[in-house]
Structure formats: structure tokens, C-alpha cells
Regions:
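FAD-dinucleotide binding site
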Residues: 1-461
Length: 461
């Protein structure tokens, strides 16, 4: 059920967390600020018409996400995730894809880690305690469901006006044949199988995108090949120190300007969010296979169904978390302070890195070090519906090799929907650039990225 802030205040109880001293430990060194070369303003080609329908994500610039996922940059290792997952005084528990060791950066990881954190909290508490969860994404929803099923009183706080976090479905039957998915919705076959029984049986709620094609300025060309990346990573893992994936490729003699290699790296970035120029070669991002599965339907509504009996406060950003060995106090963005015995924090890594939530006292040094060491990944999605198809290929996954396209991966949903719908995927540093564009420039960049697939004028009619 949904509740107002007034209801929360009435039920908050008289207890409050005592006076807390700021931690006197040194701060971890922040990652150096990266600079990017300004991108020329995109120009849309005439051969690619303006879309009749347009939607896109901007997770990289969203203050409640600051990214789409997480990955390990060169010089870090998976133990950073384990450090961040450690409870603090058995009062604060962290959960989400960034703290999962087995499937980090994925929806499966978010679900599994929510279960881990919920079980840890249940073990540390009794059924008289008041519990809260910060963040109503997949991890927050799953944790809330588990705590409620265990007989606990739990309140779920979400900064946005809707639940789902970085899962975002737009249900609009008048504009789209299926709900556009702006967040996490693409899964490998293994992840799809893993989610069955964990979250929902997705067998009848997914599309199998399993035919791929690669195009350059001359037309269709050879498909992508992940072998050069795998070979470079294998050699890099035998070296004395870690290196970024692109550095490992260069050391192995690869030409980073090769269009086919650039397309392969863009495909990896679009599916993992990892920037190849920063990602670890010792613990590299997974190179996706030739196919993926796309989850369809209103995922927001499905997550909402899991919250029956849970108090949910949307449009309630948590600005400050004060804690000691007696409990936790949450201060909302409007100034209200609410007291709880224990809290699970599922805020995205990017929010923690940008200090979107103040902790008092500061988190332990190991937690702050882990937050600084991990990297936020970026994935943006652009949905485009056209009045009629301007392309000839029937493949469902398109790759762009060569040229200066900002979006190098496209999904063709026309074979499934019967309508000319394309979905652009962009990851890593290019996703950051795309998120920062105005709507006009983002649309132009998307159209320009499709130029290779447009049928030549003399082939039309």
C-alpha cells in the first residue's frame, strides 16, 4: 500500500538515533576526473526519416541513479564488492547488483543480492523491530517482499514517483505495440533461465533476439568476433599488473581503430555498461554472445504486485542516514526524520559515489574504499517507431562497423511486433555522451547512427 509522509511521521515512533560523531578516518582517494572531447552537434541524414515515436533513457544524468550498472576498473578486484556488502554494526545492510559477487552488474545479481541481504537482516533482528529499505528497484522490492513474508514490518522508500528503479516500462498502447523498456530488460539465455523461479517465469514474457548482422558504409559485412578481445585478455591475465581492456588489446598488437574491433567493443559496452578503456582485463566484462533475450510487458506493474502488504513511500528521497549501535534515522529530502531499527540500502553505486546520500557518521573506511574503487557503468536506450521501414534486413540485432555513429548496436523488433520499431543501445563513455544530449540532438544522433541501414534511393519503390 502507498502512504503519505504525514502517515510516516505519525508512525515513526518516539525513538531517535543518538548524537553521532563524524568518523576520523582518512578518505579514500577519489578517482581522477575524466575529460572528454566535445562531440560535434549531430546531423540527421535525409535517408533516415524522423521517428513517429521516440523515447530514451538518461540514467547517466539521472540524480537517482548516476549510471546503469557497475563493473571493475583496472587495478581492482571482486573483493571490493564483498567489502561493500558487509553490514555496518548490524544496522545498515547494502544490497544490489554492485554488491553481488556471482552475477554483478545484472538483474540476476540484484535479485540474488537482495535475498542475501534480507536473510542477513532477518538473522540479526527479531519480529518486533521496525525495518526500512532505501530504493524500490528490483533489489529493494525483492528484499521488501522477503522481509514482509518473514513477518516483519517494513517500509520501502523510493526517490522517484514510481517504483522500479532502473527497471522502467512505459505502458502506452496507443503509441507502442509493446511497452518500451528504458532500463534493465536484456538478458543472456543463462540469466533468463536463472531468473525463472527467482523473480518470475519469463518464458512467455521474452523475445529471442538471435539473428545478427553487421553493416558498414558499403552494406552488410562480416559479423563481430570476440576472439581478439579474449586473446588479449588471456595474455593480460598472465602479466604482473592489471591493465584496461583497450590497453591489453594494444599490447597484443590489435588496431584499436579497426572498425570491426570498435563494433565488438561497442557491443560489449552496450550490454555491460563497462568502458573498455577503464575496464579490468584481469576481471573483464563479459563479451555477449550472438543473441539476447528481451523481456516484454509492464515490468513496473509486475514489481508493484510484489509489494502487497508493504508500506511504500514514493517521491521520498532519502538525503541522510544516521546510525549507531541502537538504530538508524532516515532524513528525507523534505526534512522529516524517521527512526528504524535496521535498514537495507539499495541505492545505485553511482548515487553512493556522488554522495547523493549523506551517512553520519561516515561509512567505515573499507566501505568508502569499495565505493571509490568500483566503477559505474552506463547504458542508454533509444526507442524509435517509424511510419514505415526504411531498412531491408530482417535480422534482429544490428551492429555498425565504421563511421562515426554514436549508437553502434540496434535491435529490430519489427519481426515480433509487426510494426517498424528499432531500439538503439549504447554503453560506456558513449552512453554518457548520449545522455547529455538535448532531445533534438539525441534524435539526430540516433538517426545518423542508422544511416548504413537505410536503403539507397535507387532501391526504393
Amino acid at each position: 500500500m502507498s502512504i503519505t509522509r504525514r502517515t510516516l511521521l505519525v508512525g515513526a515512533g518516539a525513538g531517535a538515533v543518538g548524537l553521532l560523531l563524524s568518523a576520523c578516518t582518512p578518505e579514500p582517494e577519489p578517482a581522477p576526473t575524466r575529460t572528454r572531447t566535445p562531440m560535434p552537434r549531430p546531423t540527421a541524414p535525409e535517408a533516415v526519416p524522423a521517428p513517429a515515436g521516440w523515447l530514451r533513457s538518461t540514467w547517466a544524468t539521472d540524480p537517482y541513479s548516476h549510471g546503469s550498472t557497475s563493473y571493475l576498473p583496472a587495478g581492482t578486484d571482486p573483493t571490493e564488492r564483498q567489502r561493500l556488502a558487509e553490514p555496518v554494526l548490524d544496522r545498515l545492510f547494502f544490497a544490489g547488483e554492485a554488491t553481488d559477487s556471482d552475477h554483478p552488474g545484472t538483474l540476476v545479481g540484484a535479485v540474488d543480492d537482495a535475498r542475501r541481504a534480507a536473510l542477513a537482516l532477518i538473522s540479526a533482528s527479531d519480529d518486533t523491530e521496525r525495518l526500512a529499505i532505501v530504493g524500490a528497484g528490483a533489489a529493494g522490492v525483492i528484499a521488501a517482499r522477503m522481509l514482509a513474508d518473514a513477518g516483519h514490518e517494513v517500509t520501502l522508500f523510493e526517490a522517484r514517483e514510481h517504483i522500479g528503479g532502473r527497471i522502467r516500462s512505459i505502458a502506452d498502447d496507443e503509441q507502442w505495440p509493446i511497452p518500451p523498456q528504458l532500463g534493465a530488460w536484456l538478458l543472456s539465455e543463462a540469466d533468463l533461465a536463472s531468473l525463472d523461479g527467482r523473480l518470475v517465469d519469463l518464458g512467455d514474457r521474452s523475445l529471442a533476439l538471435d539473428t545478427a548482422t553487421t553493416w558498414n558504409a558499403e552494406g552488410e559485412t562480416e559479423g563481430l568476433d570476440g576472439a581478439p578481445i579474449a586473446q588479449a585478455v588471456e595474455k593480460a591475465q598472465a602479466q604482473a599488473s592489471d591493465a584496461a581492456v583497450t590497453d591489453a588489446l594494444a599490447a597484443n598488437g590489435a588496431d584499436l581503430d579497426d572498425p570491426a574491433l570498435s563494433a565488438s567493443l561497442a557491443w560489449m559496452a552496450a550490454m555491460t555498461g563497462a568502458d573498455p578503456s577503464r575496464a579490468s582485463s584481469w576481471y573483464p566484462p563479459h563479451f555477449p554472445g550472438d543473441g539476447v533475450h528481451g523481456v516484454i510487458g509492464d515490468l513496473d506493474a509486475y514489481l508493484g504486485e510484489q509489494l502487497e502488504g508493504v508500506k511504500v513511500a514514493t517521491a521520498s528521497p532519502v538525503a541522510r542516514i544516521a546510525y549507531d549501535d541502537r538504530g538508524v534515522s532516515l532524513r528525507l529530502g523534505t526534512g522529516e526524520a524517521l527512526s528504524y531499527d535496521r535498514v537495507i540500502v539499495t541505492a545505485p553505486l553511482g548515487v553512493l559515489q556522488k554522495q547523493g546520500i549523506e551517512f553520519a557518521p561516515a561509512l567505515p573506511f573499507s566501505h568508502r574504499g569499495a565505493i571509490a574503487a568500483l566503477a559505474s557503468g552506463f547504458i542508454e536506450t533509444a526507442w524509435m517507431r517509424f511510419d514505415e521501414a526504411f531498412w531491408t534486413t530482417e535480422a534482429t540485432i544490428w551492429h555498425v562497423a565504421g563511421g562515426d555513429a554514436l549508437i553502434r548496436t540496434w535491435l529490430n523488433l519489427q519481426p515480433f511486433t509487426g510494426e517498424p520499431v528499432l531500439v538503439g543501445l549504447v554503453g560506456g563513455a558513449d552512453a554518457e555522451r548520449f545522455a547529455e544530449l538535448s532531445e533534438r540532438d539525441a534524435t539526430a544522433a540516433a538517426r545518423a547512427s542508422l544511416a548504413f541501414f537505410a536503403a539507397p534511393a535507387d532501391d526504393e519503390g
